């Protein structure tokens, strides 16, 4: 609930829950001129909430929880997808695929948040991680994390 509340507080839309993953997006169904800023703020607040939870878990002698987040922005298609008998409100597109790949790369870079070069906003201290070429694309993308 805590992580979901943070996403909603920052204007995000929950797309779906997949195991231990929450997929969310900003800018739909209502436009959001500050969608990248709001997604970044949500990711930072989620990081802080998780650090607090992990401190409690450590005190109780339990294992910590580690998460990863990928932030990317770009053109997407948003709407109801599926059939007439079962459909979901969701988002599709290359920008979504890159965000998912960034999230899945967090372990490789020992990072809890990876942001594409297209999604950097003012007010944070970024650390360059790498330049990656995404499957199916020829142009590399620079990726960053936000220092803790």
Language model: regions and residue ranges:
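Short, surface-exposed loop/helix-turn segments at secondary-structure junctions
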Residues: 58-59, 81-93
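A short pre-motif secondary-structure segment
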Residues: 14-16
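Short beta-strand->loop micro-motif that forms the acidic, two-metal-ion catalytic signature
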Residues: 18-32
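Cytosolic regulatory/linker segments at or just downstream of nucleotide-handling modules
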Residues: 76-78, 99, 105-148
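A structural signal for short, well-ordered beta-strand segments
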Residues: 22, 67-73, 143
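Active-site loop/short helix in cyclic nucleotide turnover domains
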Residues: 7, 26-30, 75-83
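Alpha-helical scaffold within the catalytic cores of cyclic-nucleotide enzymes
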Residues: 1-12, 28-69, 94-107, 117, ...
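Allosteric regulatory "coupling" segments in signal-transduction proteins
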Residues: 36, 87-92, 129-132
């Amino acid at each position: 609930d805590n992580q979901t509340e943070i996403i909603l507080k920052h204007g995000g839309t929950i797309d779906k829950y997949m195991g231990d993953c929450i997929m969310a997006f900003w800018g739909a169904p209502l436009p959001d001129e500050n969608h990248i800023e709001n997604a970044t703020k949500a990711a930072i607040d989620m990081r802080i909430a998780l650090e607090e939870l992990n401190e409690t878990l450590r005190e109780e002698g339990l294992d910590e929880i580690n998460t990863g987040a990928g932030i990317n922005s770009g053109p997407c298609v948003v709407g109801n997808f599926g059939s007439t008998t079962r459909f979901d409100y969701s988002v599709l597109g290359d920008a979504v695929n890159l965000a998912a790949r960034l999230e899945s790369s967090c372990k490789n870079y020992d990072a809890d948040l990876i942001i594409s070069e297209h999604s950097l906003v003012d007010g944070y201290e970024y650390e360059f991680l790498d330049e990656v070429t995404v499957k199916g694309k020829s142009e590399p993308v620079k990726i960053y994390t936000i220092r803790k």
